[in-house]
C-alpha cells in the first residue's frame, strides 16, 4: 500500500463523477489512478493541471494556450483574479512539484501526497467552475461573480462596513 492511497481514492471518486462529462480530464485521471509509480503520478498530475488550465485559458482569456508555459498562464489567471488565490497556490504547487516526475531529479516519495491533495482541491474547484453535474446535482456558475469563492467574501465585507456606518 502506497503512502498516497487515500489521495488516490479521493481522485478515483472524482474520476467516477467526471466520467463521460469531461473526456480530456477523464483520460488523464484514469491514467493517474491506475499507476503506483511516483514519477508517473507526478506526470499525470501535471497533465490534469494542463487540461484544466488550457480549458480556463480558452474560456476566460478567450484564446488557445499554445506553447505558453503553464506558470505564465497561472500567473495571468492570478493577476486578473480569474481563479481564487487558494486555487492558484495549489496550481503553483502541482506545477512546480510535477517537474520532478518529468525530469531526472531526486525527490522524496512523501512529496507526492501534497501534489495529489492539491490536484484534488483544483479539480473539485474546477468541477464547480465548469457546471459539471456531480452526483446528480448541477452546480451553476454566475459569470459576474468571481468563481466559487473570490468576490463573495469581499462583497459580504462591504455590506458589513456599509451597515456599520449607517448605524453610527
Predicted regions and their residues:
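Amphipathic alpha-helical interface elements
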Residues: 1-164, 168
